Amino acid sequence: MKLTCMMIIAVLFLTAWTFVMADDPRDEPEARDEMNPAASKLNERGCLEVDYFCGIPFANNGLCCSGNCVFVCTPQGK
């Protein structure tokens, strides 16, 4: 009986301690780029111009500025 009461008290104490010591997320930045704005610039990629190698061919792969890739970036059809 005493052991059960001590275990219950210990669990309640540790639970309360966790809530008291937890960080308040309202004071922190919301997005990763707000945490370290310089790092977000590393993720920005430029597109490849016409006649540059773009890899596996498929439309709108995001590598070519024109959006057309057939092993090399091709100009947009008009």
Swiss-Prot record:
Residues the record lists as Glutamine amide modifications: Q76
Keywords, alphabetical: Amidation, Calcium channel impairing toxin, Disulfide bond, Ion channel impairing toxin, Knottin, Neurotoxin, Presynaptic neurotoxin, Secreted, Signal, Toxin, Voltage-gated calcium channel impairing toxin
Domain of life where this protein originates: Eukaryota
Propeptide: 23-45
Keyword Secreted belongs to the record: yes
Covalent S-S links between cysteines: C47-C65, C54-C69, C64-C73
Molecular-function annotations in GO: calcium channel regulator activity; ion channel inhibitor activity; toxin activity
Compartments where found: Secreted
Signal peptide span: 1-22
UniProt KW Secreted keyword: yes
Classification via PROSITE patterns: OMEGA_CONOTOXIN
Chief localization: secreted
InterPro entries reported in the protein's UniProt record: Conotoxin, Conotoxin_omega-typ_CS
UniProt tissue specificity: Expressed by the venom duct.
Gene Ontology CC entries for this record: extracellular region; host cell presynaptic membrane
Domain free text: The presence of a 'disulfide through disulfide knot' structurally defines this protein as a knottin.
Record function comment: Omega-conotoxins act at presynaptic membranes, they bind and block voltage-gated calcium channels (Cav). Acts on high voltage-activated (HVA) calcium currents in molluscan neurons.
Protein's name in the database: Omega-conotoxin PnVIA
